[in-house]
Amino acid sequence: MNITVAIDCMGGDHGPHITVPSAVEYMHHDCETNIILVGKPEVISRELDALKVSPGSRLRLHPANEVVGMDEHPAVALRNKKDSSMRVALNLIKSGEAQACISAGNTGALLATSRFVLKTIPGIDRPALAVILPTISGHTYVLDLGANVNCTAEHLLQFGIMGATLVSSVENKPNPSIGLLNVGEEDIKGNDVVKRAAELFRSSGLNFYGNIEGDDIYRGTTNVVVCDGFVGNVALKTSEGLAQMLASYLREEFRRSLFSRLAGLVALPVINAFRRRVDHRQYNGASLLGLRGVVIKSHGSADSYAFRCAIRRAVEEVRGGTLRNIVEHIETLRNNIEQNIAQPVSIE
């Protein structure tokens, strides 16, 4: 299956210096993926010249003369940057020239511009950011990670549907389990929105595990973890900070004395294996679900390996038919809910 992906070459902390070589290398390893490099032609051409690569049938340039700054307000970018590399790349999906877009640019601007250009899938009120996090047993998908700070119970249900569909489409895992992130497992725990969301999940026909707590994320208790964007973003950033702290502690201990340095040399193979297992770069690429097109947000500081992982994520979603499957599942589950849902139950 031939796939064409549009790359926002100007986005991110490193811009074309990372995005262009990463896209070219990915294309060389996947003979069924075509690349459109979107951005300032003269800048992209310099990067291609350095790689000794020329545009061809599988690699082409598409000009865009504006760049969305990493700290630019989303509304300003949407209103004033109509020829930005980000917006032009998204327009390529809308026109049918590409099936996916990858950007390491301004997250808020990408959210706003994606929603404006592509619109949401029927039955989806708001798009959500989904990321993969490592767990004891493998990995889990968590959404939302910051696109929606204030959510209704219906929004959380939609996130669950999209997350479960993503897992089943990309990983060929039927009936993935869904957990609702809460302050406790009991039904009486949580605010009214979370309680109502739990009722909706139970009536949906989805494989709803129930309420889960923060530690369940990394235990791998469920395949999908659902929460609002405020909770999800705090959980993600806390996890990143904890990982940095533990790595710092480990370095300090191994440098503390000559003996600890020698111990570090002996333990080096184990340490390297551990690093590979928890390497966050392999999970780079947040899926912006709920749009009429595949959009992947790469981390702004991603290196070449991490950006290639984001491209791979986009290709997997297209090949798995994630967009089509979400549309079908939304319609099916909406019919189920209309037929089966009971009146809200008051929990004292």
Curated annotation (Swiss-Prot):
The keyword Repeat does not apply. It is found in: Cytoplasm. Pathway: Lipid metabolism; phospholipid metabolism. Keywords: Cytoplasm, Lipid biosynthesis, Lipid metabolism, Phospholipid biosynthesis, Phospholipid metabolism, Transferase. It holds the Pfam family FA_synthesis. InterPro entries: FA_synthesis, Phospholipid_synth_PlsX-like. It catalyses: a fatty acyl-[ACP] + phosphate = an acyl phosphate + holo-[ACP]. It is an enzyme of class 2 (transferase). One of its GO terms (molecular function) is phosphate:acyl-[acyl carrier protein] acyltransferase activity. One of its GO terms (biological process) is phospholipid biosynthetic process. Its EC number is 2.3.1.274. GO terms for cellular component: cytoplasm. Homodimer. Probably interacts with PlsY. Belongs to the PlsX family. Catalyzes the reversible formation of acyl-phosphate (acyl-PO(4)) from acyl-[acyl-carrier-protein] (acyl-ACP). This enzyme utilizes acyl-ACP as fatty acyl donor, but not acyl-CoA. NCBIfam families: plsX. This is Phosphate acyltransferase.
